[in-house]
Every structure is written in structure tokens, then in C-alpha cells.
Amino acid sequence: MSGKRLDGKIVIITGGASGIGAESVRLFTEHGARVVIVDVQDELGQNVAVSIGEDKASYYHCDVTNETEVENAVKFTVEKYGKLDVLFSNAGVIEPFVSILDLNLNELDRTIAINLRGTAAFIKHAARAMVEKGIRGSIVCTTSVAAEIAGTAPHGYTTSKHGLLGLIKSASGGLGKYGIRVNGVAPFGVATPLVCNGFKMEPNVVEQNTSASANLKGIVLKARHVAEAALFLASDESAYVSGQNLAVDGGYSVVKP
């Protein structure tokens, strides 16, 4: 489909300062959206907004584990632009790989607080804003192949993403009567700062590892591929799609369950 697929849409992207989030900010604004970048990485987030143009993107500091800050981020967006059409809840963390015998419960709590509870808070307040304005909006959440397959990521991360998939399904059921869609986008291993730092690997090593275990050969998974899937779910092209988890994994989760 040609043309600007989010023309006139107002979007919040959490975790928008780097990685998949930053790539999505760029792609969404290319397609006509005005985006509020939500993150705790202030310098990076502000730099992304400036590089795109502050008429198209703005930055708002928000810790997703703090519900008051989440509510304020949504209020900021609605006050600035008059509405909210799309939430791309992408903020997340990944803890170190350890045996379940050595599981650090503090790390587990932090991962779940950001990846799952933070997303729940944003869905709650974004949906409220959409309902109040009569917006038939779209909510997209970054899940993972780890949302359905164990053994590909640390225990806390895997647990949080399994829970997030349940939240997506539950929220889609509760928000359908308002015309609000809720979906997930589930990438395989992308060489983002989050993954590289979490696994202590250089980007080329992450890509080599992903390509070696991938089902689909001859292509390297990039953040742009995930952003393009999120764009589809955010746009009206997916107008009758809700409660789904769109895998961007080259068939990995199908052939290696």
C-alpha cells in the first residue's frame, strides 16, 4: 500500500529512544504520524526527536513502572495534540542469563515491572484517552519469540513476555466494544542495544547467532523489519486484526517450538 499510512495519527512509542523504538519513531513519522517518544534515556530520546524534526516528534521522560508518570505521559500527548490514536508499547529490559537454581528474584521483579506491569499501565491510560475521545485506536505491544517458546531468553524475560501475551488477549477482549484493537509484534533476536547489552555481545555477533539458528536464510533480521510489522498493526490496514501476536521471526517459532 502506497502513501502515508499513519497520516494525521498521534502516536506514543515507549522505549522510543533506541533500538526498535527509535526505528519505529522514524518509520511512523515518515508515514505522517506525530510521535511522542517516551523513555528514560533523556539525551538519546531528545536526539531522536531533534533528528526527525520537533514538528513531527517530541520527547517525554517517563518511567513505565510509575503509573503517575504513565498517566502524565498520556495527558501530555492529548494536551499537545488533542487526541491519541496509537500506542506502541515497546519499552522493555532483559536480565542476565542464569540457571533457574540461581534465579535473582529482585531481577525477576524488575523485569516483570517494566515489561508487563508497565505495559499494563500504558494500555490502561492510553485506552482511557481513546475511549474519552471516541477514538477507534490501535495498541501494539512488543512481545518476543520468548512469549511462546522457552529456552530462548532469561527466565524473567520469558515469564514477562508470556504474561504480556495474555494481557494482549485479555485487553483486546475488553476493548473491542470501543473499537480499540490490541496486538503484539514478536521479534526474533535483533541486534538492538537492549539485546547486545543484555547478552554482552557485539551487534555482529548477535546477528550471526540469530542467522545461524534462523529458519529463514539469506536475510538478517533488523529493527526496521519489526518496525514495519508494528506499522501494519498500527495502521488501518489491520483494521479487523485484534488479539494477535505477529511473529517477525522468519518462521522460527513454527519450526522450532
Swiss-Prot record:
EC number, UniProt record: 1.1.1.-
UniProt entry tagged with the keyword Oxidoreductase: yes
Oxidoreductase in keyword set: yes
Keyword tags: Oxidoreductase
Residues annotated as the enzyme's active site: Y157
Family: Belongs to the short-chain dehydrogenases/reductases (SDR) family.
Name of protein: Short-chain dehydrogenase reductase 3b
Organism of derivation: Arabidopsis thaliana (Mouse-ear cress)
Upper lineage: Eukaryota, Viridiplantae, Streptophyta, Embryophyta, Tracheophyta
Encoding gene per record: SDR3b
